[in-house]
């Protein structure tokens, strides 16, 4: 009976596969949004203000960061929880694939969230005259919470590795 239960639990890892497919669709939507922004910029580039252009470029950076985060979560999640990716040509295999454990994924996700939050905060500061001070303060507090959380997770990971190495 125990053997059957273990096989069922182990096979259930494939339930993550549709989640990864959903993330792939999310990445497609982000790509469409990215090119929508590019298409919007092109006819207006000569009449657009510098700050307007910077805001749109920040949006593009934001989309790129979220897209990179999605790719990292999809690939590492697949390799860690579902199955190893069999890429015949090793020269095409991404260098970090197969090397990220759950803790390193968490740290990379946390640092990506901090980077995304930084871009949002910069965009907010560029439009500060249009935004209530309370909203800016709240966004700074949220950003600092992300930063402290990322540091905390990295510290815990570092300490657990030290303890593991002592054993």
Curated annotation (Swiss-Prot):
Q: Which GO CC terms are listed, alphabetically?
A: plasma membrane
**Location (main, coarse):** membrane
**Into which family does the record put it?**
Belongs to the UPF0114 family.
Report the transmembrane regions from the record.
15-35, 53-73, 136-156
Coiled coil regions, renumbered to chain: none
Q: What is this protein called?
A: UPF0114 protein in repA1-repA2 intergenic region
Membrane topology listed for this record = Multi-pass membrane protein
* Paired cysteines (S-S): none
The superkingdom listed in its UniProt entry is Bacteria
Q: Where in the cell is it found?
A: Cell membrane
Q: Does the keyword Secreted apply?
A: no
Q: Which UniProt keywords apply?
A: Cell membrane, Membrane, Plasmid, Transmembrane, Transmembrane helix
